[in-house]
Regions:
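Glycine-rich nucleotide/cofactor/substrate-binding loop typically near the N-terminus or early
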Residues: 54-94
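Conserved phosphate/anionic-ligand binding catalytic regions in large, soluble enzymes, centered on
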Residues: 11-29, 276-295, 346, 408-417
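Functionally critical mobile loop/hinge segments
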Residues: 52, 414-416, 421-523
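Intrinsically disordered, low-complexity terminal tails and inter-domain linkers enriched
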Residues: 305-375
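Beta-strand segments within the central parallel beta-sheet cores of soluble alpha/beta enzyme folds
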Residues: 41-53, 307-318, 322, 368-390, ...
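C-terminal regulatory domains involved in ligand/effector binding and gene-expression control
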Residues: 78-253, 262
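Alpha-helical support elements that line or immediately flank enzyme active sites
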Residues: 20-37, 293-305, 364, 374, ...
């Protein structure tokens, strides 16, 4: 069994405000509805009910869980559904019939979804049971699902299926990951790419990573353009848009020392979009979704063309590192780049001057410096995401990425470590510097509680992402100033996070029963 989780599962496009409380339950309800349809039972269904246990029951209303369940029972997919179709789907339920799986109308009332916050099932703190009854009230089907963090779900009685044979490079710990990379002569990103290409073609991997990044970038743009208040009784005001305006005004006067402030604005933008139920990418969760995109955008906007890397090199496997990756001296390092030459429209990931396309040598093509810069950035983001995927897989396999299971250390701490490692990679860091950066970032989030005020993913979640984004950058810079050797290993920190999560009171694990949630007055 391998710890590795595909980037296309770890970074999933969905809706806010929570991966474990919105995306996961929607997927579970959708799976239940699909099973009714596929088994033919749907023709006999007269009613569908659901029970939300533990953390899902405690903070479900603030996290939009019942709304997500209704959307999932309709057959809607979090990756493609219009976010407006999910918002308040249960909260503003007018009564009448629910179209299950898009096929059968059954009577539905708001109290068909029951909240049981004091009941915790042994499988996971985030549990829900869905029941289909016939017209006489007899049970036709019943399934219990666990939303295990990051939008991942598991059906009761179903083992977590991780087929090691599908991945050529198998590792369960950071130590094993580094050993595999040493043995194969790979960067961490290249190791992840090898595993991804066991499932998809090289072009499909590149295009898929680009799609993930584009969704992240659109989320940042949407958050920076929005204003007003976020949903819920706290009436929290959006700030990303006003900060953007202030920063743009400052830049217009000639101030240029603003990258760190933009970093915070990027993170706020994502998490404000998430809190509003908008389109967001799990990274690795929704509650921590602003950290990695903010750090990646910080690199894209302020560092990608600066040449701030370590050395200029191409690995034996063709991946650019250091300044070559960052676009420094791109004319000499890369030669011409011809966009959109691949069959699927994706730009080539590796360009050799003697390659001919349609009889024309690339070194005879007209150099498009803007295309070179764009291609370099795209390569960098793919490297960033692949590195983060390998690191995030370790947290998911050996500890947790669920706030209901491990507190906020599991969500924000993991995301911060992934972002720190990704940034270190695109800044030309070695594998051991990457591991060091991830360790630094996680170490200083140990013990962090998940205590959302009012059960909403707003306070302290939104600001916390901005602070963690800054921490990720600091961790990367510290690691890059070292040689990769350090006293505390990433594996030791992952295990410490796991143990701390076990010891942590449930009051501090996404139940809103302790911490800020009981000391801040809801107005």
């Amino acid at each position: 069994m391998s710890a590795y989780v595909s980037a296309f599962e770890l970074f999933s496009i969905g809706v806010g405000p929570s991966s474990s409380h919105t995306v996961g339950p929607m997927r579970a309800a959708r799976d239940f509805a699909a099973r009714l349809r596929d088994t033919g039972l749907i023709a006999r269904v007269g009613r569908v009910t659901g029970t939300l246990y533990g953390s899902l029951g405690a903070t479900g209303i603030g996290h939009g869980t019942p709304d997500a369940v209704v959307a999932g029972l309709r057959g809607q997919d979090p990756a493609t559904v219009d976010p407006d179709a999910v918002r308040r789907a249960w909260s503003d339920w007018p009564g009448g019939a629910l179209l299950v799986a898009g096929e059968r109308e059954v009577p539905f009332a708001k109290d068909d979804i029951v909240f049981a916050p004091r009941t915790r099932l042994p499988g996971h703190p985030n549990a829900m049971t869905l029941v289909a009854l016939d017209t006489d009230g007899r049970t036709l089907a019943e399934e219990t699902y666990f939303s295990i963090g990051g939008g991942f779900i598991r059906r009761e009685g179903e083992e977590v299926r991780v087929a090691a044979q599908q991945f050529p490079l198998v590792f369960d710990t950071a130590e094993e990951l580094l050993a595999v990379c040493d043995e194969q002569g790979l960067t961490i990103a290249e190791a992840a790419r090898r595993n991804e290409e066991a499932l998809r073609s090289e072009a499909e991997v590149a295009a898929g990573l680009d799609e993930i990044w584009d969704a992240m970038a659109r989320c940042i743009e949407a958050g920076l353009a929005a204003d007003g208040e976020l949903p819920g009784m706290l009436r929290v005001k959006r700030r990303a848009g006003s900060i953007r305006q202030q920063l743009e005004d400052a830049e217009a006067t000639g101030r240029r020392e603003l990258p760190g402030e933009w970093l915070g604005a990027f993170a706020l933008a994502v998490n404000e979009e998430n809190a509003s139920g908008g389109r967001v990418v799990t990274a690795p969760t929704n509650g921590a979704a602003g950290i990695l995109p903010a750090v990646a955008m910080y690199w894209w906007r302020f560092l990608a063309d600066s040449g701030l890397g370590v050395g200029n090199a191409v690995t034996p496997h063709g991946e650019l590192v250091g300044s070559a990756l960052l676009g420094f001296a791109a004319r000499q390092q890369l030669g011409p780049v011809v966009p959109d030459v691949a069959a699927d429209g994706a730009a080539l990931d590796r360009v050799a001057p003697d390659v001919a396309l349609d009889g024309v040598r690339l070194d005879e093509a007209v150099l498009d410096e803007a295309a070179v810069a764009e291609a370099n950035r795209r390569r960098g983001i793919r490297r960033f995401l692949l590195t983060a995927t390998a690191l995030g897989s370790l947290f998911k396999a050996n500890a947790s990425i669920s706030g209901a299971e491990g507190g906020c250390q599991a969500e924000v701490g993991s995301a911060c470590a992934m972002a720190a490692g990704g940034l270190t990679a695109v800044m030309g860091g070695t594998n051991r510097q990457i591991e060091n950066a991830a360790e630094i970032a996680m170490e200083h989030h140990l013990g962090l509680t998940c205590d959302p005020v009012g059960g909403l993913v707003q306070i302290p979640c939104i600001e916390r992402n901005a602070i963690a984004a800054s921490t990720a950058v600091t961790a990367a810079r510290l690691a890059l100033r070292g040689d990769g050797s350090h006293y505390v290993s990433l594996d030791a920190v992952v295990e410490t996070m796991r143990q701390t999560g076990i010891d942590m009171s449930t009051k501090y694990k996404e139940t809103s029963e302790g911490g800020l949630a009981v000391n801040v007055i809801e107005c």
